[in-house]
Amino acid sequence: MAKTLSKPASGALAPWLGISLIVILFDQLSKIAILKTFAYGAQHALTSFFSLVLVYNRGAAFGFLSTASGWQRWAFTALGIGATLVICFLLRRHGQQRLFSLSLALILGGALGNVIDRLVYGHVIDFLDFHVGGWHFPAFNLADSAITIGAVLLVYDELRRVRGSR
């Protein structure tokens, strides 16, 4: 009897794409609300260490390359689309690995949330602003939070896998 290669079930991909879609929806809805509520640079303090503020980020994380001549919009858009393709491939192959796939789904949703901003507005909309004393963390958004949480879970999953193989 001939062996056949089994294809990953497309159903294994659907739940993870659903999580990514939820991240994108919350991210985009929060940005729309901020755009409708705040003027650029306007700040609303919610606590002594946390404010909402509308800022535009033409670069990457922490404003990296934000003062470049404009090429970064398309470079980071292409990077986000490339990451999307790689993540979808990994989700199809490893959809049964729940923590790994959850981390990728969060990263995917965050990456696409920011890609949408770059395509629609030409920059990423940031609005979550933390500051304590003289220390100030650069403003960020829900997409960035999903990417960060996904990356932390990815590292945790890998450490757990390495420890389990010993």
UniProtKB/Swiss-Prot annotation:
Keywords: Aspartyl protease, Cell inner membrane, Cell membrane, Hydrolase, Membrane, Protease, Transmembrane, Transmembrane helix
Domain of life from the UniProt record: Bacteria
Pfam families linked to this entry: Peptidase_A8 (PF01252)
Active site, per annotation: D126, D144
GO-annotated molecular function: aspartic-type endopeptidase activity
Main location class: membrane
Family matches, as InterPro entries: Peptidase_A8
GO biological process terms held by the UniProt record: proteolysis
Task performed by this protein: This protein specifically catalyzes the removal of signal peptides from prolipoproteins.
Family: Belongs to the peptidase A8 family.
Protein name per UniProt: Lipoprotein signal peptidase
